[in-house]
């Protein structure tokens, strides 16, 4: 089976500015792909080109086996970063209207809308006007509008923005459910924890260029592991241990907690052995694996 999404050498220039520079990646069927990068990295321009909303300056894009997403628009679901629904419509009417544009009959669209609203805890709000819903509720309605027609490819641009932790967790469940039924999900986010929990694969952009393309585990491997020490400690002594590249100290109520980032190639054993040999007062220690957020900073030079 062919990939759901293929980009080969895609470039987008606006006058003399290159927003996307020779970008290539693939999203497989049923895969959850995190499309990550700081502001201005080129994510939105890429999404617009994938959807056929603008043409690339160079390169090739294949969506669900065709060269133009507009030919298969009824098989694609899209949640834009800038939300917008008709404020005087009810959730049922808004969802049914957008579903009709994707080829669903009105009765089927309204039936699905009510079922999905109920599943998201919005059954009681189904017939209230959108302007009377909270921001979180309205975002749920817009998400339902993007997936009510059961698309094969779902593109979500910053879907977690503005959601409280409970609704963020609920959205994670929706994304997993989409992938479980075979849909490909591509989502952009600045919240690395979501990508870390959800993604089979991540593509990371910085200044229009791809700087990483692989699994979350592979991404984390580019950042250093850390040795965390607690006790009556001196940061300078810890920083001087073999294999330690840098350190950060935090004063707790009755002890010092020092996180020592290890140099490339160091497993921390040498530093730990030296610490005990020097008689450092260590009451607790742990080896900590890097997070995706830390890998993001290493790869892009910027915070998420």
Per-range role (PLM):
Residues 263-304:
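C-terminal coupling/interaction segments
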Residues 60, 129, 226, 281-284:
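Residues at or immediately flanking beta-strands
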Residues 3-7, 12-206, 211-212:
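ABC transporter nucleotide-binding domains
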Residues 58, 71, 93, 108, ...:
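An acidic, carboxylate-rich microenvironment
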Residues 125, 135, 190, 230-232, ...:
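Structured loop/turn residues at secondary-structure junctions
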Residues 172-262:
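ABC transporter nucleotide-binding domain
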